[in-house]
Amino acid sequence: LSFEDIKKNIPKRRENSHKGDHGKLLIIAGDEGFGGAGIMSSESGLKTGAGLVKLLTRQSHVSASLARNPEVMVSGVDNAQDIETNLDWPDAVVAGPGMFQNYWSEQILYKLLVHVADNNIPTLLDAGALRLLSHKAFSKIKLHNETVLTPHPGEAAEMLNIAVNEIQKDRIKSAKSG
């Protein structure tokens, strides 16, 4: 695909449209020490056309996120209950950048995945969220059809329980096998 191919498929915005007309993206990212993952993810949401972007991250990353991107709504979350009031807000969700295999990430991701599956909210799972999916606690969660997984070869190998070099031999075949 060329840039021109992509550009011609991006819908033009009406002159009288406003941010509320262009979708609400919820991002859950950035465990302790990895606030940049949330910052970069929220910037990407803005740059790719989301009208409203809300970032849920560790409390310690809120100030840096707001300083860098004041147009992003940022909230610090300490546990899964802290995300509940935000779950009905988005049109789409991104989760995983800067998340790890720890209690904070596990409880938040679990609550999120149950909600998006029950409500068919389009969801992109990346990085730490993908690694957590292989945990036994997540085995009963069914991802809905509007879930996109974006693993790099190491994450794909872990998810498929095969060696990275097997992924690298034929990425397309590996993706289809999962």
Regions found by a protein language model. Name each.
Residues 1-28, 32, 153, 173:
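YjeF_N-associated NAD(P)HX repair module
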Residues 1, 55-178:
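Glycine-rich phosphate/dinucleotide-binding loop and adjoining beta-alpha-beta core of small-molecule
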Residues 6-11, 28-31, 47-55, 102-110:
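Short low-complexity stretches enriched in small and charged residues
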Residues 17-79:
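Substrate-binding N-lobe of the ribokinase-like
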Residues 8-19, 36-39, 127-130, 145:
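Membrane-targeting and insertion segments and their boundary/processing signals
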